[in-house]
């Protein structure tokens, strides 16, 4: 936020994958970086994410066809959409979200996302080599699974867009799926094997290894809970849980879903507000059966 050319010092709030990546990138450009997190690197959302880096992520959730399907999704609740009364306070965001599902906005978004994904893929591979993490990297894609013909046909638009962007994919049917992943349920009739994708087997371990590289090259990690921010004439002041003030000439807020509440609580000028919606961060670990495993994310 508001980087001043007169200072090459920056504080990054949040030590998940985004925050640690920001810290590493700034450090590589010669900045003195302090990374602040109340629990430590890779302990919150980044501890349980999918660990997938895929060009198929160029497809945003708000895509053409969403508005037509919304009534069915609202009146036949399922895993894809559940609306709670508390979500109505975000109605303005919802309308903007739907507005940008129009094809012109969608086209701009997909081009921007694809450029970002392709750039970040190269950067992550470099960092993983520097952090001796090659053993955690899997370059064998991921599977988008469909239980029946209707679900497969419903993905036609998304598959067309991936083809337009030359994302490497293979179409699989039931017997192909079993050949590729023999331990998967036989309930799936179709799949799109997105080959233009990589994944890691332990996202939290990757974040922690990145953080170790950050410290090795002079970065500072500070454990603290950030309660408030205040804009200063020559930088920023942030306040911790003990009401102790800390000064930073430049600031990056990378607190994931907690970013919006911090910025609102800090009563900053409107240009610093972040209108956000985010997926709920549930994840569950299952005890594996001996000899049963998957070779790629599904």
Functional labels for PLM-detected ranges:
Residues 39-44, 240-294:
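Central helical "cap/lid" subdomain
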Residues 28-48:
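Glycine-rich FAD pyrophosphate-binding loop
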Residues 92-213:
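Rossmann-like flavin
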Residues 48-115:
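Glycine-rich active-site loop/strand segments that organize a redox cofactor
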Residues 31, 167, 219:
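Short phosphate-binding/catalytic loops that engage adenosine nucleotides
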Residues 2-3, 15, 21, 172, ...:
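Flavin (primarily FAD) cofactor-binding/catalytic cores of flavoenzymes
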Residues 8-35:
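N-terminal Rossmann-like FAD-binding beta1-loop-alpha1 element of flavoenzymes
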Residues 172-180, 222-236:
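A conserved short coil-to-beta-strand element within the FAD-binding core of flavoproteins
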């Amino acid at each position: 936020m508001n980087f001043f050319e007169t200072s090459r010092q920056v504080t990054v709030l949040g030590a998940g994958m985004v925050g640690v990546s920001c810290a590493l990138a700034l450090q590589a450009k010669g900045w003195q970086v302090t990374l602040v997190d109340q629990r430590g690197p890779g302990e919150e959302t980044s501890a349980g994410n999918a660990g997938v880096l895929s060009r198929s992520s160029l497809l945003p959730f708000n895509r053409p066809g969403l508005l037509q399907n919304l009534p069915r999704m609202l009146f036949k609740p399922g895993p894809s959409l559940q609306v709670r009364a508390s979500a109505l306070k975000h109605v303005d965001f919802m309308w903007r979200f739907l507005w940008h599902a129009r094809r012109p906005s969608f086209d701009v978004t997909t081009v921007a996302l694809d450029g970002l994904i392709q750039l970040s893929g190269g950067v992550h591979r470099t960092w993983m080599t520097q952090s001796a993490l090659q053993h955690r990297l899997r370059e064998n894609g991921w599977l988008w699974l469909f239980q029946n013909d209707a679900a497969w046909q419903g993905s036609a638009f998304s598959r067309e867009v991936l083809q337009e962007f030359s994302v490497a994919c293979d179409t699989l049917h039931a017997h192909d799926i079993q050949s590729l992943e023999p331990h998967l349920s036989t309930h799936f009739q179709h799949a799109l094997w997105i080959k233009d994708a990589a994944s890691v087997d332990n996202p939290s371990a990757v974040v922690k290894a990145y953080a170790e590289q950050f410290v090795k090259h002079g970065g500072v990690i500070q454990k603290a809970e950030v309660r408030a921010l205040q804009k200063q004439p020559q930088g920023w002041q942030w306040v911790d849980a003990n009401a102790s003030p800390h000064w930073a000439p430049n600031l990056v807020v990378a607190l994931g879903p907690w970013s919006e509440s911090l910025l609102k609580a800090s009563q900053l000028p409107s240009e610093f507000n972040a209108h956000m919606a985010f997926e709920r961060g549930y994840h569950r670990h299952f005890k594996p059966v001996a000899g049963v495993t998957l070779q790629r994310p599904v």
